[in-house]
From Swiss-Prot:
One of its GO terms (cellular component) is basal plasma membrane. Changing C443A: No effect on biotin transport. Changing S429G: In COMNB; no effect on membrane localization. May be glycosylated. It comes from Homo sapiens (Human). Belongs to the sodium:solute symporter (SSF) (TC 2.A.21) family. InterPro entries: Na/Glc_symporter_sf (IPR038377), Na/solute_symporter (IPR001734), Na/solute_symporter_CS (IPR018212), Sodium:Solute_Symporter_SSF (IPR051163). This is Sodium-dependent multivitamin transporter. Changing C104A: No effect on biotin transport.
């Protein structure tokens, strides 16, 4: 789940060139090519099925007919990128199992979207999450949110395509640009032609490939070192099994509180308001199916985290028994997993290819989701509002053209990434930097009825400035920091971003480092608190500006865009207390939207099927007393 968070310094274009390379067998190439062919076939099947009868709603929203399980697996695959597949085992190998406590944040990180964001978005019948911003604020705020999202995804998708290809090239000699082009072209074709339905079903297939590849490594690796019991014993003997680190200091990179609570805000920025995920919720048959798909992600996320952590422990136990070569130990940390896989599986034709297919499945799922979501927001937020007269056929052609265009842009960004060198780490971090302010913008609109458009715009800008100040300052500071000594098994590693003295001294108690002070300490804020810090900045600044500019006076407020925090809290009180407060109803499900006409979707009003689906979930927003709305607005 660690999207945008590489646990080590990113690969440089020259890293690993002096390290001995392993080679692929014919069977490995067959397995890898089979992944690409099957992914392309799934996309072409959905493109050819019903060719000529496709609608924009089918292309961008899978005709809002997707079931719970495929949506859940697609939600998981969207941000289970190759960066996480390489980064999580590397984190566990170098620093121990403290990162495993990230699983504690998944419960709230998925429960909140299921019961707050999904009901609001689904009942407004949106296509783009940023339509909400226009309904709540105005068109300017919508455009600002859309442009911010496009910037976030365009920067990130090039890195997601380039980084695993570079790692594969450094370890196996597999041609760098051949793999980049193959992935980019295959992904662009099936996303542009097949639309969201093709993306979701290829995500399902690629998720299975990811789990198979990782399980193969765990099974063979644990058998090689004497079983999982032996793996755990070796890791425990060398201090890699971490207990609860209860230090409340937010400047410590990984503690229980940082992982369990700071991680919640990171999860909300991904599963609550990111267009790629919101689009999947909205493609579900009913609101209930969307909520269930969000619930279903929880066990899958836990299994995914456990698998990544187990690979790190197996790798540690393996290299205790079969030490790395000096050249391998000096490679970039994110290459450790690939070296381990090639060392472990080199005598088993096809299995190295299966793991590489697993790695590139992570890239394909992330990139295809990016293409589809970018095409959707560009079409719905930047083009259709200005050209509402587009015919269905022209809109379909333009949507596919946008997906193709973003595919070419992704290849261009991959080339730019190859020229970045150390700046590549900043590009990877941008995804996390931008997610927090966008989360804050949606929370400002949803939970604070007094927030107005000027407050939203100024708050978003303040959040982005704060995000880039801390994020880039952290990267620059870490580049100039000293390197810690090698761990006990003789391999070396680089000091990761904002790693503080508390973490290092836990692993290496004989080594001391001076504590950062002043701005340097400010920059050492754990990356898991970035979303919380930056979203809070947006909310605080947005509220201050809103209060100074007259709140929502003279502007209409659609109650369907507000999540009724106060009524929800009051509904927990005894009925007698509720009567004394003169509130008849407190639920979000009882807001009256009769004053606000139904929003057209893709240029037309919802059809009978949509109304039937809404009836299955219960009638939304009916019959509230005005008292509740006034009380909520008074917040």
């Amino acid at each position: 789940m660690s999207v945008g968070v590489s646990t080590s310094a990113p690969l440089s274009p020259t890293s690993g060139t002096s390290v001995g390379m392993s080679t692929f067998s014919i069977m490995d190439y067959v397995v890898f090519v089979l992944l690409l062919v099957l992914s392309l076939a799934i996309g072409l099947y959905h493109a050819c099925r019903g060719w000529g009868r496709h609608t924009v709603g089918e292309l961008l929203m899978a005709d809002r007919k997707m079931g719970c399980l495929p949506v859940a697996l697609s939600l998981l695959a969207t941000f289970q990128s190759a960066v996480a597949i390489l980064g999580v085992p590397s984190e566990i190998y170098r620093f121990g199992t403290q990162y495993w406590f990230l699983g504690c944040c998944y419960f709230l990180g998925l429960l909140i979207p299921a019961h707050i964001f999904i009901p609001v978005f689904y009942r407004l019948h949106l296509t783009s999450a940023y339509e909400y911003l226009e309904l709540r604020f105005n068109k300017t705020v919508r455009v600002c949110g859309t442009v911010t999202f496009i910037f976030q995804m365009v920067i990130y998708m090039g890195v997601v395509l380039y980084a695993p290809s570079l790692a594969l090239n450094a370890v196996t000699g597999f041609d760098l640009w051949l793999s980049v082009l193959a992935l980019g072209i295959v992904c662009t074709v099936y996303t542009a032609l097949g639309g969201l339905k093709a993306v979701i079903w290829t995500d399902v297939f690629q998720t299975l490939v990811m789990f198979l590849g990782q399980l193969a490594v765990i099974i063979v690796g644990s058998a090689k070192v004497g079983g999982l019991g032996r793996v755990w014993a070796v890791a425990s003997q060398h201090g890699r099994i971490s207990g609860f680190e209860l230090d409340p200091d937010p400047f410590v990179r990984h503690t229980f509180w940082t992982l369990a609570f700071g991680g919640v805000f990171m999860m909300l920025s991904l599963y609550g308001v990111n267009q790629a995920q919101v689009q999947r919720y909205l493609s579900s048959r009913t609101e209930k199916a969307a909520v269930l798909s969000c619930y279903a992600v929880f066990p899958f996320q836990q299994v995914s985290l456990c698998v990544g952590c187990l690979i790190g422990l197996v790798m540690f136990a393996y290299y205790q028994e079969y030490p790395m070569s000096i050249q391998q130990a000096q490679a970039a940390p994110d290459q450790f997993v690939l070296y381990f896989v090639m060392d472990l599986l080199k005598g088993l034709p096809g299995l190295p290819g299966l793991f590489i297919a697993c790695l590139f499945s992570g890239s394909l799922s992330t990139i295809s989701s990016a293409f589809n979501s970018l095409a959707t927001v560009t079409m719905e937020d930047l083009i259709r509002p200005w050209f509402p007269e587009f015919s269905e056929a022209r809109a379909i052609m333009l949507s596919r053209g946008l997906a193709f265009g973003y595919g070419l842009l992704c290849l261009g960004m991959a080339y730019i990434s190859s020229q970045m060198g150390p700046v590549l780490q900043a590009a990877i971090s941008i995804f996390g930097m931008v997610g927090g302010p966008l989360l804050g913008l949606f929370c400002l609109g949803m939970f604070f009825p007094c927030a107005n458009p000027p407050g939203a715009v100024v708050g978003l800008l303040a959040g982005l400035v704060m995000a880039f100040w801390i994020g880039i300052g952290s990267i620059v500071t870490s580049m100039g920091s000293s390197m810690p000594p090698s761990p006990s098994n003789g391999s070396s590693f680089s000091l990761p971003t904002n790693l503080t003295v508390a973490t290092v001294t836990t692993l290496m108690p004989l080594t001391t480092f001076s504590k950062p002070t002043g701005l340097q300490r400010f920059y050492s804020l754990s990356y898991l608190w970035y979303s919380a810090h930056n979203s809070t900045t947006v909310i605080v600044v947005g509220l201050i500006v809103s209060l100074l500019t007259g709140r929502m006076r003279g502007r209409s407020l659609n109650p369907a865009t507000i999540y009724p925090v106060l009524p929800k809290l009051l509904s927990l009180l005894p009925l007698s207390c509720q009567k004394r407060l003169h509130c008849r109803s407190y639920g979000q499900d009882h807001l009256d939207t009769g004053l606000f006409p139904e929003k057209p979707r893709n240029g037309v009003l919802g059809d009978s099927r949509d109304k039937e689906a809404m009836a299955l979930d219960g009638t939304a927003y009916q019959g509230s007393s005005s008292t509740c709305i006034l009380q909520e607005t008074s917040l």
